[in-house]
């Protein structure tokens, strides 16, 4: 792939990692938003994700940063927020060869529990078919 997102592709998933050698989903979104568009996305640790208060504070910080949920069709640079079996998941909408998809860090583990996921680009419909649900699109004003 000859695209700016190629520098992230294939990097391994690691919990709470913010790059450049590994990412979790939030760390990847923060790095892409900062590196590509100069936007800040607040930190969200595993502890924050585990409580309603932590998630509410993160959502409030995102809104203070100029991000808002939109009902419009997604476009490059928007953030996808959805649910997975592990909880909340985020990614960035990216346009590659006239195809809009999601760049995200998948947290998959093998039978022994060893992380085997990583940064991938895939169509939203494929993500939804693989178990991600309740998609929301967030856009920076």
Model-predicted regions and their roles:
Residues 1-65, 85-89, 132, 138-141:
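N-terminal capping segments
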Residues 46-124:
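...with weaker cross-activation on analogous glycine-rich loops/strands in unrelated enzymes
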Residues 115-141:
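Glycine- and charge-enriched low-complexity intrinsically disordered segments
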């Amino acid at each position: 792939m000859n695209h700016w997102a190629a520098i992230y592709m294939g990097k391994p998933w690691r919990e709470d990692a913010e790059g450049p050698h590994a990412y979790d989903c939030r760390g990847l979104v923060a790095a892409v938003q900062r590196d590509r568009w100069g936007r800040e996305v607040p930190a969200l640790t595993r502890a924050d994700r585990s409580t309603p208060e932590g998630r509410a504070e993160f959502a409030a910080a995102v809104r203070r940063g100029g991000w808002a949920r939109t009902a419009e069709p997604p476009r490059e640079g928007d953030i996808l927020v959805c649910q997975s079996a592990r909880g909340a998941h985020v990614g960035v909408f990216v346009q590659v060869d006239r195809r809009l998809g999601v760049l995200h860090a998948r947290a998959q583990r093998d039978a022994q529990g060893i992380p085997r996921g990583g940064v991938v680009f895939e169509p939203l419909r494929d993500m939804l078919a693989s178990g991600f649900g309740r998609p929301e699109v967030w856009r920076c004003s």
